[in-house]
């Protein structure tokens, strides 16, 4: 929950692994929370994963969108996981190329070969234009990403400040990505029993779009995105506060 920044510990990971476990998925920085695991935490995870001999699939699409002068660490770089780590990335987030549909992965040769066989039958190949655009982004673009991340950090600071005095909600301060995962369960009632109902209320009555936390495994929260202008953030928070205030 928010009190532990929606993080798990190496001990919790070890306890969750059974003889049926084949892989775990790590998303850092995280969608929906924006929370990022530290190098020390990931190295502790790596020890557990190597001991269990299972795969780790590391979703690192937000690796470049990190704040407060922190640095992203890839669990795939831990030597003990050379044959167990599958790193997944893409150009959608860091380079704002969502519609180009380009992703990539790195991992053990046999795993990549199997994935390639499946991918070739499911989606065939990405468009050649998209491939060349992604190559240019990955090899030539740096300052533009830094400018974008700086803008996101300002928006993160703004939305956190605006929500700071909102009663009866809790959320972790994001380390990266561009989301807030806000626990709104104190506003639930017989009339508003869960995150889906609350998100529907905010959309239909106050015209702000949020994502119910049930989509991410926590029905107590809703996800907010600050991938928009500062003006929209200010107006959106006003509407959110008004919408929550109506619920008593």
Show where each model-derived region lies.
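PLP-dependent class I/II
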Residues: 1-248
